[in-house]
Amino acid sequence: MTQVTFKHNPVTLVGTERKVGDKAPNFTVVNRDLEEVTLHDYDGKVRLISVVPSIDTSVCSTQTRKFNEEASNLDNTVVLTISVDLPFAQKKWCAAEGLPNAITLSDHRDLSFGEAYGVVMKELRLLARSVFVVNAAGEIVYTEVVPEGSDHPNYEAAIEAAKKA
């Protein structure tokens, strides 16, 4: 299991750790309009899943903006930003940041995504900063669980994986 810290304090990750080559497990989350969304809703597309502890912090905000800007140049690719923030907070953030088309999804109800991908920080009930790229066939082709929650992910590696997917 990947070891991570949040604000330099060790945390326990809960769920099934995912690796490159795994079939991406389905999950159910909620969009900003309180509608259920699943991974399968985006079948046939490359999915860059950007996971943030809370969208309304500086690193999470930068991560969401950067992936949405970079991926807008990629064909057949969708960026899904997932956190446990309430959908209302995600909607407010998107409006304030001028990203009305960003897809933000909330895992607040039952941590379906977090447990399926092994990124629930047990002590905090937040998701660990991470990135997963799933190709159009549903296979995980890139994973990164950022060792320290306040650090940035490797944007370039994730975008490159999405390009190759």
Curated annotation (Swiss-Prot):
What EC number(s) is this enzyme filed under?
Answer: 1.11.1.24
Top-rank taxon, per record: Bacteria
This protein's record includes keyword Nucleotide-binding: no
Domain Thioredoxin, chain residue ranges per copy: 18-164
What the entry lists under Pfam families is as follows: Redoxin
Signal sequence region: none
This protein's assembly is summarised as: Homodimer.
Q: Which gene encodes it?
A: tpx
- The kind of enzyme this is, by top-level EC class, is oxidoreductase
Q: What does this protein do?
A: Thiol-specific peroxidase that catalyzes the reduction of hydrogen peroxide and organic hydroperoxides to water and alcohols, respectively. Plays a role in cell protection against oxidative stress by detoxifying peroxides.
Q: Which reaction does it catalyse?
A: a hydroperoxide + [thioredoxin]-dithiol = an alcohol + [thioredoxin]-disulfide + H2O
The UniProt similarity line reads:
Belongs to the peroxiredoxin family. Tpx subfamily.
Misc note: The active site is a conserved redox-active cysteine residue, the peroxidatic cysteine (C(P)), which makes the nucleophilic attack on the peroxide substrate. The peroxide oxidizes the C(P)-SH to cysteine sulfenic acid (C(P)-SOH), which then reacts with another cysteine residue, the resolving cysteine (C(R)), to form a disulfide bridge. The disulfide is subsequently reduced by an appropriate electron donor to complete the catalytic cycle. In this atypical 2-Cys peroxiredoxin, C(R) is present in the same subunit to form an intramolecular disulfide.
Q: Which UniProt keywords apply?
A: Antioxidant, Disulfide bond, Oxidoreductase, Peroxidase, Redox-active center
Which cysteines bridge via disulfide bonds?
Answer: 60-94
Q: What is this protein called?
A: Thiol peroxidase
Q: Which SUPFAM superfamilies match?
A: Thioredoxin-like
Q: Active site located where?
A: 60
Which GO molecular-function terms appear in the entry?
thioredoxin peroxidase activity
